[in-house]
């Protein structure tokens, strides 16, 4: 249901106020393509395998997370942020801590076009890999500090995920109550 995408988007945008979602079963029967179960036929017709999640932040801000198991491959950016003066695009997987490409349309600076910043800042070790939340949590407990992914943030992402089935069933936008 997109836990990584939801966590990344809410880390950048903050807590959402509402969620809407469409979910579909696109491939009710799958055939495993590798490993010990290669060739095994698997029924996958109980829950959606594709979700398009829309988060409403108010004040004209929104985010969309397209997630699921129906994509075989994609060359689309892992994350794009569209703003009034340009776009920030992350083409590499988030676990590699990619340097974004930036499209800027600024009359003030007489710039229009794509650019890739040089010499990216080195990220702190606590946020530089996919399992960082576990190491960060242990570090926070040991040093009595707040983890990067706070319990309140995790609770907010969990609330979004819990409201998604209801939003799909009712075909409407659901209010969110938690924040971080």
Residue spans of the language-model regions?
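Rossmann-like dinucleotide-binding domain that binds NAD(P)(H)
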Residues: 1-62, 68-73, 152
């Amino acid at each position: 249901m997109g836990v990584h995408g939801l966590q990344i988007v809410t880390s950048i945008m903050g807590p959402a106020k509402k969620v809407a979602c469409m979910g579909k079963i696109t491939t009710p029967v799958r055939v495993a393509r590798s490993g010990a179960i290669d060739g095994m036929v698997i029924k996958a017709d109980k829950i959606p395998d594709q979700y398009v999640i829309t988060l409403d932040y108010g004040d004209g801000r929104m985010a969309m997370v397209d997630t699921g198991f129906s994509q075989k491959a994609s060359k689309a950016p892992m994350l794009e942020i569209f703003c009034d003066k340009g776009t920030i695009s992350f083409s590499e997987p988030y676990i590699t801590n990619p340097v974004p490409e930036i499209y800027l349309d600024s009359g003030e600076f007489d710039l229009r076009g794509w650019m890739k910043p040089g010499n990216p800042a080195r990220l702190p070790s606590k946020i530089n890999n996919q399992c960082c939340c576990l190491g960060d949590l242990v570090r926070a407990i040991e040093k009595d500090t707040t983890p990067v992914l706070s319990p309140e943030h995790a609770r907010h992402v969990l609330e979004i995920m819990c409201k998604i089935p209801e939003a799909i069933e009712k075909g409407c936008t659901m209010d969110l109550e938690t924040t971080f």
